[in-house]
């Protein structure tokens, strides 16, 4: 593994690196199959490179490039996305390739300045379809923001019908065979990557696919994992993205209120069930869960489908319970949070910090929180349950607009 550069199409060479031993990526992702940092060389009259590698693999990456071209002959370095796993070698490369002009989106320039010490010429992509003349070849650029940083763009090489997408259509999967039609089944890694990296940005993904959907794609040159190679492969993986990028909808014809809570003695659960009953009275269907019974995928699905989300916890040692915080962390993966209404509730003994703390976290996620947190001391009375019911009605009415 990690042997040499590879020719992929008539004018495209892979010059990336494999990191097969990697088991955690960016702190948050398990990478049981390792990953690749894919980078590319365009063999043109004006030679160009697309993306680089993580900094600790810079020597291996540079050795790949030197197999293909003298660095002082490189004319352009296209930077589709500036996250350091794709730009970590860029500063070193610019010093070694003095004639190369870095190419980036307008938004990307801010990240470039924050990551790279460089005061030379740059080429900024201002418009979709903007072209770059490489002599015998031409590149086109399409802005695809928030997939998954604001700077992201795709690069199209018409001559080879190849689209360079960086993190879009990729996955963490290291295999020296490189091409999707040769490495075997990597669908588990492919879906996991989509869920963690791109699912929060479904709306942007649908817009990007519409933007580049007219291109006669035969190759998708991804930033991580197997290169999507051949028209049939492109159709397959494009189809998966079309399916996965659609909004999830609850069964039935009523909008969903999703409620979950952590409750040592059932008192907080009683509040949540009363609030759920109020939401049903207002015209919603409800799904109620003890947080300990929710596996992560189900929690994210429920939150995506819901128009109203209610989160509850007892207060213990001045805080919400750990399973609730762990569940809330997964909300980072939920699309369209700004369009959803949410509220927090909880029973407490003497201090009652849990519900306000949960509400603050919901607000940080940009949920709409039109009601104050609902709190009661210890066992809810009938009046408390009636108040919880009314609270649920009001929140549901807000969610229903």
Predicted regions and their residues:
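Metallo-beta-lactamase
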Residues: 6-10, 104-152, 204-209
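Active-site metal-binding motif and surrounding structural segment of the metallo-beta-lactamase
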Residues: 45, 56-103
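Active-site-proximal loop/helix segment associated with metal-binding centers of metalloenzymes
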Residues: 148, 152, 160, 168-199, ...
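Short acidic active-site motifs
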Residues: 89, 294-299
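Terminal amphipathic helices with adjacent charged low-complexity linkers/tails
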Residues: 222-254
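Active-site neighborhood of phospho(di)ester-bond hydrolases with catalytic His/Asp-centered motifs
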Residues: 50-52, 74-82, 102-106, 163-166, ...
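FMN-binding flavodoxin-like domain, especially the glycine-rich phosphate-binding loop
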Residues: 4, 175-178, 185-227, 233, ...
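Conserved beta-strand hairpin/beta-sheet module of binuclear metal-dependent hydrolase folds
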Residues: 5-67, 154-157, 161-165, 257, ...
